Each structure stands twice: as C-alpha cells, then as structure tokens.
C-alpha cells in the first residue's frame, strides 16, 4: 500500500515536471520570435552628411520606424568620445541633428551607434552611423608674411626674385589649397606663377624706378581671394662701364654750321674697372656713319667737280627724248626701267660716234633689280650702240646678264684685220650687280687691250686665284663692212633695226649715263663723282705744354669713305677728349633731308687679359630743311646741273609773289563769280656771278582755301575755257581744299592760269570772308616760296526800309555817284578791289562801300508801327473823345499838307535836283510829326505787312541804288481815304 502511494506521488511529480518543461519550452520559442521582430527595425549602418554652418544631418537611408511600437531613439556613447548629436522621432522618421555647429577643421567625421526604444522600454537592435562634416569655404588664404622686401641689381633678368607663400585654414583641397597667385598692378615689369615665384620680365633700371611696389593676392581652388600684401622690390644701382652723355638725336640744319660736334658732352664711366698696371689699359672706340638708305648710299655733290673732258649726258632730266620715261622727281632724278622701256639718244647729242677707234669713258649710276630666278640668257642693257637699219649688229654695249656686268666693243672693218681676233667682250663677275643697291660704275676704255672698271670710285682688282677668269675676256672678229649703215645709241635697251623696236631692256633704276669722248676720266674725276659730300671729321691730336702728345699714346684712323673713325687711347681722359671732337659735315648745298644713324662701339682690354665690350651706342643725325627767312620772298638753293658740262654752283634764286592782300566783293559779284587772283604777280630772280638773271620756269603752284569749300554752293573753276591749262604743261586739280597745279612751265603761263581762277558762292550770306593762300615751287618742288595770302571779304547789305513802289530818278542817282567819287576812289584804292575791266562793278561797289562808311541811325517802320499799336490798344475811351474833338483840326491840316506835297512832287519831277552832299543822306526827323488814326486798323496791318516783305527783298532794293531815300518822306494822304 505504501509502495502504491509512493509510486502515485512520483507519477504526479513526473507529470508536473513534464508540464513545467513543456511550458518553459513554449515560452522560449515566443521570446525568440519577438526578438527577431525587433532586430529588423534599423538598418545595419547609416551614412550622414552635415555642413559646417548647419545642424541637420542628411541621413542615407532614412531612419524609418513605426511610432506605434517605437517611442524613442538612443545614441550609444563610447567612453572618451564626445558625440555632439541628438536623434528625435518625428513622423515615423529618426531625425539626427547636431547639438552645435561643427568645425571641419577640428574633426572631419564622427562614428557612433544608435538603437530604437520600444514603447515598453525594450531597446531594438543597434545600427552604426557614419557622419562626415562637409567643409564650407569660410576662410580666405592668408600669406605667411605680412609683407616682403627684397633688393635686386639693375640690368639683370632673374629666373626668380623671391617666392611668396599663402595658406588656407579650410579642411578640404577645394577650399583649403592655394591654387593661384596674382599681381594686381599689371603695369609693373614682373610676373608671378602659381607657386608664388616672382620674376622680372625686363631688365630693371635704377634711373627709371628705384623701387617697385607690387600688390599680390592669393586664391584658393574655389577662387576665393585673399587680402593683398605689399611686395617691395628695390633696384640696386649697378655701375655699368659705358659712355654717358651721348645724345639720342643730333639735329643738323644745312647752312647753319659748317660742321657739327656729335658728342660734346661724352664721358666714359669705368666704374671699378682697372688693370693691375694702369699702363696696360687700352680703350678702342669706333664711330660709324650709316647712310646706305640715303639717296645713292650718301649725299654726293658733283657740282664742284671740274674736268677738262667734254662729258655728254645721255639721260638728262627734262630732255625731249626722256619725257616719256617714268622717273622720281628729286635732287637727283631716278628713271625707272621695267625691261620694256628705253630711249634712243638723238643724233644731235652724239653723231654716230665710232667707239672702237677712239678712247672714251662711260659713267653710270644704277640699281639692278635682281630676281630670285635668274635667266642666264637675258641681256639687260644700260647703254647700247647698234645698227640703225638693215642689220642688228651691236657695236658697243654695257649690259647685265647672269649677275655679271658685261662690256661689248666690236671693232669695225679695216683692211687686213678681218681675220684677226681681238678682245671684244669683258665679263666681270661682281656681287654689286645683283645686290639691289645703288652703285657707281666707270669704264675707262683707252683701246681694245686696256679696259678698266671702277666701282664706287675704286678700281676693280681681280684676286690672284681668279686673275685669268675675272674679268673673262672673249675675243672675236671685227665686224664685216656694211656701207651706208650708221648706229643708233639707246639707253635702257638696245635698238633692233630689223624689228624696228627696242629690245633687251633693263630692269631697275638708272640715275645717270654719261660718256666722255676722245679721252678717259682721270682718277680725280672719278673720285670727285663718287665721294660722299657728308662724312665724319676725325679729331686731330693736340699738343699741350704739360702733357705728352696724344699721338704718343693714342691712334686715330679713318677709312677712305670717311664714314668710319677708329680711336685708340690709353686712358679715360684721352678717349673722352677725342670723342668730344668728332664732327659731322655735309658740304652739299641742298642735302637730303632725313636720318643718318650713328653707331659707337667701345672695348676695354688689359694686357694679357680678356677684353670687355661696352654696350653699343645707337644715335642718329637728323638733317633738317634749311632755315628760310620769314615773309613772302624766300631764298632757295640752286641744285641744277647742266647736262653737257659740269658748271660751277649758282647763287640762290628768289621767288616773289605779290598782289593785293584784301578784296571786297558784293553779293551779286560773288554769285556770278569773281577772279580771286587777278592782281597776282610772280617773279623769280637769281644772282649768278654778280648778275641778276631771271628764272622763267616754276614747277608747281597751290591755292589753299580756308575753310574748305562747300560743294553744295561753292565752286572754283577756270574762267572761259576749262582746258586753258591743258594746252600747256600744267596739270590742274581742283577740289574742296583748293587748286593744285603741277608741271614745269613758264611763269607767264602759271600767272595766266592763276588769274583765270573764278570763285563763286550761291549763298554768300554764310561767310563773312574767305582766305586763299598761294605758294609756288621751283626745281622739282625742292624750293618753295612763302605763302601769299588773299582775304576775300563779302560785303553784307544793310537792312533796308519797307519797299517803295517809287523809283529813284536817274538824275538823282547820277548826282549821288558824282558827289561821292573822291571818297569812293580812295576807298577802293586802299582795298585793292578795283577792276578796270568791268564798267558795272565800280558803280555797284560804291553803293555797298558807301553803306559801310555812312551808317544811318534810322529805325525801321516796322518797329514804329508796333510801338504805336501798343500805345493805341492801351488807351482809355477818353482818348477817342479827345481825338474826335481834334478831328476837324487834323482834317484841315491834312488837306493843307496834301496840297503842299502834290506841289512839291510836281516841282521835283520838272526841275533838276541840286547836288546832294554826303550830309544830305543823314536822316533828320526833328521836324517830323506822325499822327495815326487809331480807327484805321487796316492801314496799320498793311504797313506792317509791307515792311516784312521789304526784308526779303533787300537785295533788289540795293540794286536800285538809293531808291529807299523816297521812303523817308511821310505821305499821310491815305489817312483821309476810307
């Protein structure tokens, strides 16, 4: 029994345990399911961005929860780490905010964990949060130094003068790195790169500026600009060994001085340069005058060259056979040849001269236009003597072919010499022919065995290695006999008689071609023609009592052309004295105006040491126009040279322009046209060998109008036949600025054209006067006269009274003119405007002149009428009563005056007028009484209208003489007419 009880209790306990374990197991499964639902509330990680100046964090992805289950969030803090954030639950979203504004420069990112809190207080699973602080460009770059100061040497180019550096406190490369530097004042010769390195772009000069102050800024990569800082770059003066006191420009005026010192204030600054032994110092200087661009390489004056030989000019300027050539007018005429032009010299100059039998010389000055592609077979003749008909044989010629100067001389037929070879062609291979420069060539031909060539005054000498080939001499047979065939001499080409045309033309410019017949030019003649009139004068060594002669320690040399001087001295004092005495001179009477460059080179050397080359000095001489005296007459220099002989220089001629300086014209005259220069005279006289000689030719004249013409109503034309100047050698060009006349012709022809110029103006009221300036020139426009000025004054008519229908009697008009004859004649004599060829002009001019001399103080009726109307309108009614009361008295007076007036008119028309003196024209209104009927309104309006009409017809009234005098007589008869 006891066993059964015990067993029963054991079963009950066992069952209870089973039930207990079963309940525990069920509860554990429910708890795991609940926890699993909590873990999916948050993501494993979140990433956030926050700007420095904001507090809201942008979270990706969004923290989404269910507010029915989640009531809060919690940030899990770690020890020793500050988490400046908070999280709030708003509308099922977790909003993460910063407790304060963050600073990227202090900390760029934050890492922490968050969890959601269920409403029952149970926490959810945790999630990692990574927040990055976004930088804001809140800081500008700042330089490490507040300013920079540095000193540099002048005259140097530095790769880097100094380096400036700036930094930025922002934390990201975009805002925190400096990407650019800039110099704000761009006018300074400096540059800066992106690394802050400053260098100069040109050598600095202490004289120009001893301190350069730069304003420099820096930019970060977002181009935020820093505050500027000052960079001071001081220029340290460096002593440079060189000549100082050398002028940049030297003015030279012909006729002012015979010679001109170039460097009167020259001083050599040696700085600290010295030799161990002072006697070992040597200073070398060279002064070069560069005139290649002037005229033919320099100014040449052959006016003083004298020669016993008869020189024929085959290319004279102004000759009949050279008129068709294209040329430049100037001191030395230059003829242009293009390969298709040339001229034949008339037989009257050289009559079929046999060049093979007599000695002769050819002198020429030309510039050959060499081409890139040279045809080796093309001949370009300077001078050529060939058959005049039947054949094309060349007897004598000077031509260029394949950059060689070739001279041809064929012997004529002589019995016994037909089969004998003799030199016939000389070929010089010289660079001067094809260098496009001017060169002077002289050929002296004494016989067929001796031909000498001179280039720029220097005799051509062949070198040893090519003495047999330069010149290359070609032998040939004499020409065959040809009866009745003469020669034609051509310049710039060669005459081909079978084709009857010029051929083998020259390409280039030729200034002169001359020949000396029966004799050759001497060395003195050649040198005189090629010597430059302008050159440098070397200083002369001087001897003092206390010092050694300069020649002991110094050397002075100059070249043959006298355009270079070499000076060598042993000390600073000597070289300075020599440089100060170097002079320039130009002996040509009329030097070429322009610039001549001067170059000075200096070197220093000590014995057994390397030499030091000083900076070259570039300056120039400016040759100016000769100084001319003021006034109309001007002295000019004669630079003409006779074509047949070398004549001595002549004295300067004078061009004198004379005439009236003022001309008065009326409206009617200027509308029809006036001869502006009808009283002009031109004279040109020169003094030669103490005798006065008249120069009958001038080259150009110009008439300048001031102000310029208005083509709408002004005009200048040639009176009568517009082709007047075309029959002469004068070309006339008329434009709004005046008249230009060009062409060499006689003075009388120029005067005829000038006097025929007619100026007209359809609207003369626009101008009070006109100014015409006349100037003329001689000798290819080299010498100009002074300006002759003529002032043309327009006489404006005086405002006339209202027009009257009465005409002035002719007898009264005649008396007025006769009475004023003396005054008018003297007035016109002074003004110089009398024209004896026009009988109507003096009469008309007197009327205008008289109105200018005698001004009458008479008010116009229009003003009187307005004045009276104003008073009448302002009168009281009582004025009408007073006027009516006196009406009878006025009526009686009016009738009496009317009868007297009619009687006076009858007497004036039937009796001669007495002579009217000048004072009679002065209006005396002391006894005049004017009464106007205020009721006669229409009379007033008619008079006013008539006065206005008279203003528009003032010119017609003036034409009628003194017709306005009758208007001064008061006629009150119409007052009583109703």
Swiss-Prot record:
Cytoplasmic side of membrane: 898-978
Pfam annotation, one family: CLSTN_C
GO MF term list: calcium ion binding
GO annotations of cellular component type: cell surface; extracellular region; plasma membrane; postsynaptic membrane
GO BP annotations, alphabetical order: calcium-dependent cell-cell adhesion via plasma membrane cell adhesion molecules; cell-cell adhesion mediated by cadherin; homophilic cell adhesion via plasma membrane adhesion molecules; positive regulation of synapse assembly; positive regulation of synaptic transmission
Residues bearing attached sugar chains per UniProt: 53, 304, 486, 608, 823
UniProtKB keywords: Calcium, Cell adhesion, Cell membrane, Glycoprotein, Membrane, Postsynaptic cell membrane, Repeat, Signal, Synapse, Transmembrane, Transmembrane helix
Residue intervals of the Cadherin domain: 37-143, 144-249
Signal peptide: 1-26
Positions on the Extracellular side per record topology: 27-876
Transmembrane portions of the chain: 877-897
Composition skew (Acidic residues), residue ranges: 948-957
InterPro entries, sorted: Cadherin-like_dom, Cadherin-like_sf, CLSTN_C, ConA-like_dom_sf
Cellular location(s): Postsynaptic cell membrane
Topology relative to the membrane: Single-pass type I membrane protein
Coiled-coil positions: none
Stretches the record annotates as Disordered: 937-958
Superkingdom of origin: Eukaryota
Comment field on protein domains: The cytoplasmic domain binds synaptic Ca(2+).
Family: Belongs to the calsyntenin family.
Function: Postsynaptic adhesion molecule that binds to presynaptic neurexins to mediate both excitatory and inhibitory synapse formation. Promotes synapse development by acting as a cell adhesion molecule at the postsynaptic membrane, which associates with neurexin-alpha at the presynaptic membrane.
Protein name per its UniProtKB record: Calsyntenin-1
Species of provenance: Drosophila melanogaster (Fruit fly)
Lineage: Eukaryota, Metazoa, Ecdysozoa, Arthropoda, Hexapoda
């Amino acid at each position: 029994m006891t066993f059964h009880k015990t067993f029963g209790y054991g079963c009950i306990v066992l069952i209870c345990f089973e039930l207990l374990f079963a309940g525990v197991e069920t509860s554990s499964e429910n708890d795991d399911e609940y926890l699993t639902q909590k873990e999916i509330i948050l993501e494993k990680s979140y990433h956030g961005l926050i700007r420095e100046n904001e507090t809201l964090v942008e979270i990706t992805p969004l923290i989404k929860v269910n507010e029915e289950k989640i009531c809060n969030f919690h940030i899990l803090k770690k020890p020793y780490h500050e988490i400046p954030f908070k999280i709030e639950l708003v509308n099922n979203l977790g909003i993460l905010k910063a407790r304060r504004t963050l600073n990227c420069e202090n900390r760029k990112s934050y890492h922490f964990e968050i969890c959601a809190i269920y409403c029952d207080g149970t926490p959810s699973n945790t999630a990692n949060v990574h927040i990055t602080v976004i930088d804001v460009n809140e800081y500008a770059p700042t330089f490490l130094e507040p300013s920079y100061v540095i000193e540099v040497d002048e005259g140097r180019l530095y790769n880097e003068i100094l380096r400036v550096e700036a930094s930025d406190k922002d934390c990201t490369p975009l805002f925190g790195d400096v990407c650019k530097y800039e110099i704000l004042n761009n006018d300074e010769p400096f540059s800066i790169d992106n690394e802050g390195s400053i260098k100069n772009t040109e050598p600095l000069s202490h004289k120009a500026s001893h301190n350069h102050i730069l304003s420099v800024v820096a930019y970060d990569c977002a181009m935020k600009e820093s505050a500027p800082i000052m960079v001071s770059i001081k220029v340290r003066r460096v002593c440079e060994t060189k000549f100082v006191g050398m002028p940049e420009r030297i003015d030279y005026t012909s006729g002012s001085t015979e010679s001109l010192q170039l460097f009167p204030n020259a001083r050599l600054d040696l700085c600290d340069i010295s030799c161990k032994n002072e006697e070992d110092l040597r200073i070398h200087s060279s002064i070069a005058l560069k005139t290649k661009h002037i005229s033919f390489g320099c100014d040449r004056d052959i006016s003083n060259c004298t020669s016993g030989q008869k020189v024929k000019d085959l290319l004279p300027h102004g000759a009949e056979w050279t008129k068709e050539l294209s040329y430049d007018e100037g001191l030395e005429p230059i003829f242009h040849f293009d390969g298709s032009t040339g001229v034949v010299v008339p037989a009257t100059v050289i009559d079929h001269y046999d060049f093979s039998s007599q000695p002769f010389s050819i002198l020429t000055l030309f510039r050959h236009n060499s081409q890139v592609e040279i045809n080796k077979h093309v001949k370009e003749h300077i001078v050529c003597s060939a058959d005049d008909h039947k054949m094309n044989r060349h007897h004598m010629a000077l031509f260029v072919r394949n950059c060689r100067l070739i001279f041809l001389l064929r012997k004529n037929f002589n019995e016994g010499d037909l089969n004998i070879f003799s030199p016939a062609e000389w070929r010089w291979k010289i660079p001067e022919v094809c260098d496009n420069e001017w060169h002077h060539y002289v050929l002296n031909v004494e016989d067929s065995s001796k031909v000498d060539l001179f280039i720029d005054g220097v005799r051509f000498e062949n070198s040893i290695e090519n003495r047999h080939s330069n010149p290359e001499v070609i032998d040939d047979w004499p020409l065959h006999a040809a009866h009745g065939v003469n020669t034609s001499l051509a310049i710039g080409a060669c005459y081909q008689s079978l084709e009857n045309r010029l051929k083998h033309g020259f390409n280039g410019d030729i200034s002169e071609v001359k020949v000396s017949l029966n004799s050759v030019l001497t060395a003195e003649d050649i040198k005189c023609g090629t010597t430059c009139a302008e050159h440098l004068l070397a200083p002369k060594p001087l001897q003092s009592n206390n010092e050694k002669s300069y020649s002991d320690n110094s050397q002075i040399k100059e070249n043959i052309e006298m355009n270079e001087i070499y000076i060598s001295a042993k000390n600073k004092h000597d070289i300075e004295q020599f440089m100060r005495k170097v002079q320039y001179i130009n002996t040509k009477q009329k030097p070429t105006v322009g610039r001549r460059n001067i170059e000075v080179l200096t070197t220093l050397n000590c014995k057994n040491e390397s030499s030091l080359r000083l900076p070259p000095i570039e300056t120039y001489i400016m040759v100016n126009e000769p100084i001319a005296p003021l006034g109309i007459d001007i002295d000019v220099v004669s630079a003409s040279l006779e074509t047949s002989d070398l004549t001595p220089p002549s004295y300067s001629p004078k061009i004198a322009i004379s005439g009236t300086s003022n001309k008065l014209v009326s409206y009617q005259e200027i509308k029809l046209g006036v001869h502006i220069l009808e009283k002009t005279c031109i004279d040109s006289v020169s003094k030669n060998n103490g005798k006065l000689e008249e120069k009958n030719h001038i080259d150009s004249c110009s008439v300048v109008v001031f102000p310029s013409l208005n083509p709408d109503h002004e005009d200048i034309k040639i009176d009568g036949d517009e082709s007047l100047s075309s029959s002469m050698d004068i070309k006339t060009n008329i434009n709004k600025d005046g008249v230009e006349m060009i062409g060499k012709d006689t003075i009388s022809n120029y005067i005829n054209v000038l006097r025929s110029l007619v100026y007209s103006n359809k609207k003369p009221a626009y101008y009070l006067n006109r100014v015409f300036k006349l100037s003329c020139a001689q000798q290819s426009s080299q010498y100009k006269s002074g300006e002759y000025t003529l002032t043309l004054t327009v006489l404006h008519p005086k405002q006339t009274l209202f027009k009257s229908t009465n005409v002035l009697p002719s007898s009264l008009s005649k008396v007025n003119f006769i009475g004023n004859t003396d005054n008018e004649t003297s007035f016109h004599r002074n003004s110089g405007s009398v024209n004896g060829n026009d009988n109507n002009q003096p009469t008309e001019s007197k009327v205008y002149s008289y109105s200018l001399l005698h001004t009458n103080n008479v008010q116009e009726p229009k003003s009187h009428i307005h004045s009276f109307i104003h008073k009448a309108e302002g009168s009281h009614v009582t004025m009408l009563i007073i006027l009516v009361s006196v009406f009878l008295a006025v009526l009686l007076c009016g009738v009496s005056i009317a009868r007297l007036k009619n009687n006076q008119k009858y007497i004036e028309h039937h009796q001669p007028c007495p002579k009217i003196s000048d004072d009679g024209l002065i209006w005396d209104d002391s006894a005049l009484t004017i009464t106007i009927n205020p009721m006669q309104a229409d009379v007033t309006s008619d008079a006013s209208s008539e006065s206005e009409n008279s203003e528009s017809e003032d010119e017609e009234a003036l034409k009628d003489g003194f017709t306005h005098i009758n208007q001064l007589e008061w006629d009150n008869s119409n007052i009583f007419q109703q």
